[in-house]
Amino acid sequence: MSSRTLEVHVDCDEGCFELPAWRELFARDAKRHVFASPEWNRVWWEEFGDGKDLLILTLAAADDIVAICPLYRKVEDNKKILRWVGGIDLTDYLGPICDPDDRGEVADRLVEWLGTTDFEWDVFDAHNMPVPFGFTEFLVERADDAGFGFALQQEETAAILRLPSSWDDYLASLDSKARHELKRKRRRIEREHPDTKVRASTKETLDGDLKIFFDMHRGAEGMKGHFMRPEIATFFERVARAFSDIGWLRLDFLEMGDTAVASTFGFELNDTLYLYNSAYEPDLSRLSPGLILVSELVSDSIERGLDVFDFLRGPERYKYQLGAEAIPLNNVQVFKEGTSR
């Protein structure tokens, strides 16, 4: 443990996301989630980094980087807040990029740095940390041992579906009511609209497909319709183009004839399909086009041998109707001054 050294890069710019060690560390773990990729973090920072200070902590053993902690500092209400790069609202999973066996030491070194650094901070506000990864416990324990005040809360849940080997096995895994409803809805749309099909976006169709997705999203009722503000659409577009270039983008449509009636925006890598966002035509809600499209993507994922269908954050009921299990996400706040809460 003592042979490992923590380096802190406080004069970072976008070039820090091109560190070869980051790409190597990301590639080393076949189950690393998409939000740990340098591509995701770079696009997020370039779009939302104004008014923030970027710093990258790297833990090295000899010449080998074993962990990366991408952080930023922002002043809010006269307090200097540290957070994971990726923010709160747009990045579903956050935390250090490291092997699970190194979580304890990463927490050790991170908390040690918080206690000794000249870099000014008041609160380390760590959001969206998946409970199964287990970093939360290490961070809280080390912060408490070091005498820092802290607060721990579950802030949201994600939902994941571990895929079986066949569609029949998948249907059998659902409870009887959910299975009956899914079959009924799929039969109804086939009966009433036999020209219904699923279409995947390609590099050649991406420009037009993004416009279809944005228009459909903005046509939704309530908060969903208001979410796709211009700056959010720009971020989605930049992610789409960056991920399309490396084969990670999944932009899919349910079409009746030549008309799109539902769409999903997601990613695929490491045998996992991530469902990041979706939209459907509200005038056709009776036919559940969004649910039908997602069920088709589940079917396709099973057929192609993927391991996980990750619905990501959000409490939407349909995720659990389709057999997903809840994954709690924790928020830990570490206070430079104050007592434990």
Residue spans of the language-model regions?
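Conserved beta-strand edge residues that scaffold enzyme active sites
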Residues: K203, P315-E316, Q333
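Acyl-donor binding region in acyl/amide transferases
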Residues: D53-L54, K74-Q154, N270-A326
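Alpha-helical membrane-targeting segments
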Residues: K336-R341
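Short, low-complexity, intrinsically disordered N-terminal peptides in bacterial proteins
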Residues: M1-T5
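A conserved beta-strand-loop-helix scaffold within acyl/acetyltransferase catalytic domains
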Residues: L6-A62, V66-R83, M129-A158, R162-R286
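Acidic/polar loop patches that form or flank catalytic/metal-binding clefts of enzymes
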Residues: K224-H226, L251, L306-F311, P328-N331
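Short functional hotspots where side chains directly engage DNA or cofactors
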Residues: Q321, N331-Q333
